[in-house]
């Protein structure tokens, strides 16, 4: 079964982008390549159970088991040793990526308190968009009663676009609610 957002991309967004940016081939049209969700768990240094909770929550949110990230350097001020587990990340591609993006845009972001749209300035100059979320409770899979600690996460949407303008147009047409 083809995802609703993937179908919209193929049938409506690609022709629209080709017309707007004067592409000669449909392969020039930018597309979402992958979505990386990263959750840093700073208190995993003192309490290893916190990391397991974060992994479980990220598994529920992404529908895929995350990879545990380890510290690259030792930092004495944070009581951190090189190689200690300090977070979790998951990379979504294909069907799961479109399902997550659809859920993020249509269900999760509207549940954010005092939400007026996401920043237009969070592009990196190469067509990738980074979004910070302050609490994992905006996702429908997370049960409020089971959460011990509110954690944020970073969501990076990697596109094949060459410029920020192309990427912004792609994400706008996919339904990303940018601030006015």
Swiss-Prot record:
PROSITE patterns: RIBOSOMAL_L5 (PS00358). It holds the Pfam family Ribosomal_L5_C. SUPFAM superfamilies: RL5-like. The keyword Repeat does not apply. Keywords: Ribonucleoprotein, Ribosomal protein, RNA-binding, rRNA-binding, tRNA-binding. Gene3D superfamilies: 3.30.1440.10. InterPro entries: Ribosomal_uL5 (IPR002132), Ribosomal_uL5_bac-type (IPR020930), Ribosomal_uL5_C (IPR031309), Ribosomal_uL5_CS (IPR020929), Ribosomal_uL5_dom_sf (IPR022803), Ribosomal_uL5_N (IPR031310). It comes from the Bacteria. One of its GO terms (molecular function) is tRNA binding. GO terms for cellular component: ribonucleoprotein complex; ribosome. Part of the 50S ribosomal subunit; part of the 5S rRNA/L5/L18/L25 subcomplex. Contacts the 5S rRNA and the P site tRNA. Forms a bridge to the 30S subunit in the 70S ribosome. This is one of the proteins that bind and probably mediate the attachment of the 5S RNA into the large ribosomal subunit, where it forms part of the central protuberance. In the 70S ribosome it contacts protein S13 of the 30S subunit (bridge B1b), connecting the 2 subunits; this bridge is implicated in subunit movement. Contacts the P site tRNA; the 5S rRNA and some of its associated proteins might help stabilize positioning of ribosome-bound tRNAs. Belongs to the universal ribosomal protein uL5 family. This is Large ribosomal subunit protein uL5. It comes from Ligilactobacillus salivarius (strain UCC118) (Lactobacillus salivarius). The gene is rplE.
């Amino acid at each position: 079964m083809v995802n609703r957002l993937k179908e919209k991309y193929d049938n409506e967004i690609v022709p629209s982008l080709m017309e707007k940016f004067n592409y000669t081939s449909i392969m020039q049209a930018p597309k979402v390549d992958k979505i990386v969700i990263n959750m840093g768990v700073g208190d995993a240094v003192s309490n290893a159970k916190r990391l397991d909770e974060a992994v479980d929550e990220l598994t529920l949110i992404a529908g895929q088991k995350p990879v545990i990230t380890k510290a690259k350097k030792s930092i004495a001020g944070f009581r951190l040793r090189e190689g200690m587990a300090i977070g979790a990340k998951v990379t979504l591609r294909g069907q799961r990526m479109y399902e997550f993006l659809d859920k993020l845009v249509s269900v999760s972001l509207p549940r954010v308190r005092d939400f007026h749209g996401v920043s237009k300035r969070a592009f990196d100059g190469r067509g990738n968009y980074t979004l910070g979320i302050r609490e994992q409770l905006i996702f429908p899979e997370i049960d409020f009663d089971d959460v011990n600690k509110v954690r944020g996460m970073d969501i990076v949407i990697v596109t094949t676009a060459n410029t920020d303008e192309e990427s912004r147009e792609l994400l706008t047409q996919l339904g990303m609610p940018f601030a006015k």
